[in-house]
């Protein structure tokens, strides 16, 4: 083949006109800990910090790269393509630590990728001469550096490591078909033939243990997950529940095996340690177990709700039952007899009313009877990574139902539908098609699964129908082909071809890229190895490719075209038609030189029919299609905003058909539209795949850490395209992003602040904090100005300042309306709705997938997403990965209508995601106001007898008094001589010393942390962190707040723990420290790996009648560290005048003494004798429930105006993420709440991780 140079010059480096810079790549956890850091990284100057971080963190090879290399001469290969190996002689001259290094330059990565492709292309005979090979090598490197295109992640991981660095290792059970002999060969090297494929479809037969069967599939899936790829399978061949087995007996059914596969996938994070397994499960709609399958995730979500709610109800009532026993003033066993203990009787009735099992109630009473004062009952939450979700099944795959047209027509006519046995083919059940359709609609509405595969349409466009039907897809549903095949992907960045100045899309440049990258992907098939024999053979036989694009949403906005418009859809259709037409034309050209794919001859008639149908759509024909059940949406020739795109598209398809009829095709498929998650970040795409944008204001990462707000770069370009003046554009931008200053702010500005008592110095402080503030309240708080200033200068009392949810601006007299107006001016509206100068008819140009900002109301409709997909689908070999976002108030009928429209517009697949359909996702608004909870409390109070009402009201009065005491308290100084304990341990190979200091009553008041032989910086940070925690404890911050914030944080050092009797593994130093403190001071044995007390109600006991011993524990607690004894004093002996008594630390009061209700703090009971002592015990129980707005104020500002994060809770971080336009879920790799929906998957904007395979 001849290769044209379009971007490079013969004899010049492809990087000659590209500036490069050095940067530091760093990714941090939300708590500030470093996940990854690499210095002196060389990247193109125009690359963003996020693109640089993703390249450095994910795609740089960090091990085994020899510092000295030498070329291996090959006679038949041009010298510039000779591969390299380590130069052992030169390496021996270097210090041992310097011999093997990491890749540090983007040029190294571009060179190894393009060099490897060109090397194999040369050996495969793809180039006419040396000059063509050199041009191919140079053009590819230029395109990669300019972010014009990117291959899928496995190419970045694996391709060129053997060619560029001589990295090698023994085979891992992979296979390839030798391109020169055509023979299936087992790989002897793990690297010589790279594994560049991201997407796999695997078959599974109705066989338990043999090759190709059920258990074999889990092994094959594990091999793919390990290397970072995704896989999908159709399980419809598996027998339904109750079907006969060949050896006698009955089948356990489809679902039993799907649950095994789900557990296996959940145990393996895709890529070994990087992300969850990417997996697709498909079941045909006529399978006997289809109803159970459709309801699978719905019922599992219900189980999560039951676990969460039930655990809270059980804990509440069981603790109340135990408390009624412990606080009883009766004698002997009377306290444990509900007939003699009215309080116990009442609590048992309440527990039964809440359906707490009688057996458990009885168990707790027996537990109390043995002398125990508290019970540990785990409470679950709806967090995606919580124990509740880990307990249920069905959470590790995308589930789809495969529908044929006869089912959908039965839905339209209200016909019957038969479910058929797998073996006998007999009808096992007949039901109404609409009833099953209703189940599908409800399940999608309630749990976001199943998605749908429109199987008839998929197979109508199938190029190789003679070789079998398409039955499944990869996890993201863009690759659809025969079982046991694979596809390697690459995506073009459409925006790089658009010239903003000339308002013209470079069609020729786009065609040039499509041609070259068809060759790249074809060469990748030739050089690849595969995880099984079948996949190796069929991938060689059909040679499927997956070229696609990204940034269509960014391109449309830049051009000033609404995503939901005829022009936008026509442009999308034309660009897609050009791409696939050129790829098939190129495939035919390769076939003329190297021959067709081996399966072509058998399928020539089917393939040419499909190509003719593609061509008809490109020529705008509405009918005349061959053998299609549903006609596609043809190219809109009139509405396309750039006429030459239409003519190029039609010419490409004319040539593709003409050359194909003459030479055949090298590839059975050539294009898909993938979600482009991680690779979209490497290309700095505003939008991924075919998606619109998700927000107009983005948070751009800085090289030194932190973020700053910027307008989406497409917005000013769109405004210029729409004819706005630069001054108007500047004002619209400032409206969206904010002015970052008090200057000219309405309501709140320098003059109004001075009138309220603010000094010039205070105003200067807040001005410094405002440019990076997400909300004005983040800057106007006590951490910016200091409590002394607010109290002394502004005259606000200490009690008000310390109150939860304290709002300084409201406290000094500003109204909510004034605050909101100032907030929009200073911090930005995060939307252009309501912006000055912007005409209402231009609003649709800036519509996103979700409403933007706090005041944004507009977002793209469900139908607009589906119609955009329909505009592209007729020109795609495979399908489109996309999830349709639906608002929270969407109905089941809306879901069914969306699916029905998708079928009628000839889509091959679709999936829906209704906002709030997962329990783990936070709602955008509160269901009912807090005061309605108070109404419920009043109603329940009136239901009780007068004595109980009096007791409850009195308790509330005490509670308020206690709370007031707590709120008003100043710093509680530690005693000069204090007790505590020192714990030495080794965490992940690093020595850690934890020392505690306690108040006289045993409460924790300070901690010291030291790390043995660590660097000065880390030791200093850890020491100062301990001081900060100690100050918080002394000012009344409950220990459980720290425990909740810092347990389960992840950063190095981490790993096994030695030297601690309770903690055996920690995910970080902070995780270890706060687990230890929680176990020792809060009796949080759920955070321990070994229970130090074994004080469960089924334990053997201590050998004494614990409930009848004298109360001596409160004396002993003043003499011994509560932490050292793990909050237990039952093993202490108090000597008094020669007599011995067993001290029961938390026992009941002696008979005859006054009894005050004990106020327990997180499992550590405390006998309280008066209100003040009650306040001390109760302070850790005070729950500062914040509103969503208050939760956002977790960001605190230091006196310098710099943001200081006190690690807000997950709920707080979710709320902020939702406000910024993210999904509100946490990235499982870096812990940041920056996930955006990406096709059927999710993508992290911080670290680049995806839940899919690109």
Curated annotation (Swiss-Prot):
Pfam families linked to this entry: Ribonuc_red_2_N (PF08471), Ribonuc_red_lgC (PF02867), TSCPD (PF12637)
GO terms assigned for molecular function: cobalamin binding; cobalt ion binding; nucleotide binding; ribonucleoside-diphosphate reductase activity, thioredoxin disulfide as acceptor
Family to which this protein belongs: Belongs to the ribonucleoside diphosphate reductase class-2 family.
Protein name: Vitamin B12-dependent ribonucleotide reductase
Sorted UniProt keywords: Cobalamin, Cobalt, Disulfide bond, DNA synthesis, Nucleotide-binding, Oxidoreductase
Reactions performed catalytically: a 2'-deoxyribonucleoside 5'-diphosphate + [thioredoxin]-disulfide + H2O = a ribonucleoside 5'-diphosphate + [thioredoxin]-dithiol
Disulfide bond annotation, renumbered to this chain: 199-487
Function: Catalyzes the reduction of ribonucleotides to deoxyribonucleotides. May function to provide a pool of deoxyribonucleotide precursors for DNA repair during oxygen limitation and/or for immediate growth after restoration of oxygen.
Gene it is expressed from: nrdJ
GO BP terms, alphabetized: DNA biosynthetic process
Cofactor(s) of this protein: adenosylcob(III)alamin
The record's free-text note on cofactor binding: 5'-deoxyadenosylcobalamine (coenzyme B12).
EC number per UniProt: 1.17.4.1
Active-site residue numbers: 474 (proton acceptor), 476 (cysteine radical intermediate), 478 (proton acceptor)
Residues involved in substrate binding: 153, 198-199, 230, 474-478, 675-679
Keyword Oxidoreductase: yes
């Amino acid at each position: 083949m001849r290769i044209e140079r379009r971007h490079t010059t013969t004899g010049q480096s492809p990087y000659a006109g590209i500036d490069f810079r050095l940067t530091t790549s760093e990714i941090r956890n939300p708590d500030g800990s470093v996940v990854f850091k690499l210095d002196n990284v060389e990247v193109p100057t125009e690359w963003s910090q996020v693109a640089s971080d993703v390249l450095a963190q994910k795609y740089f090879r960090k091990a085994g790269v020899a510092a000295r290399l030498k070329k291996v001469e090959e006679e038949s290969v041009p010298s510039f393509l000779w591969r390299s190996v380590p130069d052992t002689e030169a390496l021996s001259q270097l210090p041992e630590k310097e011999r093997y290094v990491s890749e540090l330059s983007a040029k190294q990565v571009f060179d190894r990728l393009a060099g490897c492709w060109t090397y194999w292309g040369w050996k495969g005979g793809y180039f006419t001469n040396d000059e063509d090979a050199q041009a191919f090598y140079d053009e590819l490197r230029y395109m990669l550096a300019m972010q014009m295109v990117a291959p899928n992640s496995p190419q970045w991981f694996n391709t060129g490591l053997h060619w560029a660095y001589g990295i090698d290792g023994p085979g891992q059970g992979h296979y390839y078909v030798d391109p020169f002999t055509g023979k299936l060969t087992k790989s002897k090297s793990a690297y010589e033939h790279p594994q560049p494929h991201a997407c796999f479809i695997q078959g599974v037969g109705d066989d338990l243990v043999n090759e190709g069967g059920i258990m074999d599939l889990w092994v094959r899936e594990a091999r793919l997950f390990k290397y970072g790829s995704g896989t999908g399978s159709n399980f419809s061949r598996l027998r339904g529940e109750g079907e006969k087995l060949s050896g006698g007996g009955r089948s356990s059914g489809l679902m039993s095996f799907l649950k095994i596969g789900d557990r296996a996938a959940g145990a393996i994070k895709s890529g070994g340690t990087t992300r969850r397994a990417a997996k697709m499960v498909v079941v045909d709609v006529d399978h006997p177990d289809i109803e159970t399958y459709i309801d699978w995730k719905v019922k599992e979500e219900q189980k999560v709700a039951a676990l969460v709610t039930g655990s809270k109800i059980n804990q509440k009532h069981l603790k109340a039952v135990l408390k009624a026993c412990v606080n009883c003033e009766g004698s002997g066993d009377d306290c444990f007899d509900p007939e003699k203990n009215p309080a116990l009787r009442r609590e048992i009735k309440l527990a039964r009313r809440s359906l707490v099992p009688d057996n458990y109630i009885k168990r707790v009473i027996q537990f109390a009877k043995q002398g125990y004062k508290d019970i540990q009952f785990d409470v679950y939450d709806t967090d995606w990574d919580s124990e509740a979700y880990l307990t249920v099944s069905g959470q590790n795959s995308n589930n789809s139902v495969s529908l044929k047209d006869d089912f959908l027509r039965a839905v339209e006519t209200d016909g019957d539908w038969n479910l058929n046995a797998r073996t006998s083919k007999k009808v096992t059940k007949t039901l109404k098609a609409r009833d099953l359709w209703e189940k599908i609609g409800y399940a999608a509405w309630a749990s976001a699964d199943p998605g749908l595969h429109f199987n008839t349409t998929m197979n109508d466009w199938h190029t190789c129908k003679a070789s079998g039907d398409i039955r499944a897809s990869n996890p993201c549903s863009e690759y659809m082909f025969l079982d046991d095949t694979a596809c390697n992907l690459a995506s073009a960045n459409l925006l790089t071809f658009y010239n903003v100045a000339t308002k013209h899309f470079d069609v020729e440049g786009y065609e040039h890229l499509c041609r070259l990258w068809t060759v790249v992907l074809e060469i990748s098939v030739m050089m690849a190895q595969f995880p099984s024999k079948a996949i190796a053979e069929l991938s060689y036989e059909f040679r499927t490719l997956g070229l696609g694009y990204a940034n269509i949403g960014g391109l449309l906005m830049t051009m000033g075209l609404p995503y939901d418009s005829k022009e936008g859809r026509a442009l999308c259709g034309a660009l897609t038609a050009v791409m696939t037409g050129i790829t098939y034309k190129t495939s035919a050209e390769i076939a003329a030189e190297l021959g067709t794919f081996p399966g072509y001859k058998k399928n020539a008639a089917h393939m040419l029919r499909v190509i003719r149908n593609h061509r008809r759509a490109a020529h705008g024909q509405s009918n005349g299609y061959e053998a299609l059940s549903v006609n596609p949406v043809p190219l809109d020739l009139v509405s396309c905003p750039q006429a030459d795109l239409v003519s190029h598209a039609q010419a490409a398809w004319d040539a593709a058909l003409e050359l194909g009829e003459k030479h055949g095709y090298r590839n059975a498929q050539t294009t898909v539209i993938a979600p482009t998650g991680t690779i979209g970040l490497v290309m700095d795409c505003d939008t991924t795949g075919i998606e619109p944008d998700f927000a107009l204001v983005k948070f751009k990462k800085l090289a030194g850490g932190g973020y700053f707000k910027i307008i989406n770069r497409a917005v000013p370009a769109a405004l210029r395209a729409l004819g706005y003046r630069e001054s108007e554009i500047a004002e619209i931008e400032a409206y969206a992003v904010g002015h970052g200053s008090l200057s000219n702010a309405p309501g709140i500005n320098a003059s109004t602040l001075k009138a309220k008592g603010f000094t010039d110095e205070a105003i200067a402080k807040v001005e410094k904090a405002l440019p990076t503030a997400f909300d004005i309240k983040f800057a106007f708080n006590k951490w910016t100005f200091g409590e002394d200033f607010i109290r002394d200068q502004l005259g606000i009392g200490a009690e008000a300042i310390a109150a939860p949810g304290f709002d300084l601006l409201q406290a000094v007299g500003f109204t909510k309306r004034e605050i909101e107006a100032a907030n929009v001016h200073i911090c930005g509206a995060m939307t252009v709705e309501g912006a000055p100068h912007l005409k209402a008819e231009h609003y649709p140009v800036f519509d996103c997938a979700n409403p933007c900002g706090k005041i944004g109301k507009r977002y793209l409709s469900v139908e607009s997403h589906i119609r955009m997909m329909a505009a592209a689908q007729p020109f795609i070999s495979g399908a489109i990965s996309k999830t349709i976002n639906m608002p929270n108030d969407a109905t089941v009928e809306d879901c069914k209508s969306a699916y029905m429209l998708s079928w009628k517009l000839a889509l091959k697949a679709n999936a829906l995601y209704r906002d709030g359909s997962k329990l783990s996702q936070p709602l955008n608004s509160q269901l009912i106001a807090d005061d309605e909870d108070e109404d419920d409390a009043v109603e329940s109070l009136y239901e009780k007898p007068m004595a109980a009402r009096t007791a409850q009201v009195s308790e509330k009065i005490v509670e308020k008094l206690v709370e007031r005491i707590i709120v008003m308290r100043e710093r509680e100084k530690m005693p000069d001589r204090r007790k505590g304990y020192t714990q030495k341990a080794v965490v992940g190979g690093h020595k850690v010393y934890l020392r505690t200091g306690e108040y006289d009553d045993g409460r924790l008041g300070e901690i010291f942390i030291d790390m043995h032989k660590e660097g000065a910086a880390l030791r200093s940070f850890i020491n100062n962190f301990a001081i900060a925690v100690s100050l918080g404890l002394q000012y009344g911050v409950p220990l459980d707040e720290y425990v909740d914030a810092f347990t389960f944080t992840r950063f190095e050092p981490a790993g096994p723990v030695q030297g601690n009797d309770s903690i055996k593994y920690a995910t970080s130093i902070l995780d270890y420290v706060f687990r230890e403190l929680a176990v020792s001071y809060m009796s949080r044995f759920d955070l321990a790996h070994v229970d130090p007390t074994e004080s469960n109600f089924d334990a053997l006991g201590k050998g004494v009648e614990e409930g009848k011993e004298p109360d001596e524990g409160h004396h002993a607690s003043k003499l011994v560290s509560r932490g050292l004894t793990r909050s237990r004093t039952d093993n202490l002996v108090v000597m008094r005048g020669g007599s011995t008594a067993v001290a029961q630390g938390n026992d009941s009061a002696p008979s005859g003494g006054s009894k005050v209700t004990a106020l327990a703090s997180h499992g550590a009971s405390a006998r309280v004798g008066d209100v003040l002592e009650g306040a001390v015990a109760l302070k850790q129980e005070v729950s500062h429930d914040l509103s969503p707005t208050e939760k956002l104020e977790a960001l605190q500002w230091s006196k310098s105006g710099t943001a200081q994060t006190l690690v807000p809770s997950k709920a707080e971080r979710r709320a902020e993420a939702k406000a910024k336009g993210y999904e509100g879920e946490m990235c499982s790799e870096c812990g940041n709440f920056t996930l955006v929906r990406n096709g059927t998957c999710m993508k992290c904007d911080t670290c680049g991780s995806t839940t899919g395979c690109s």
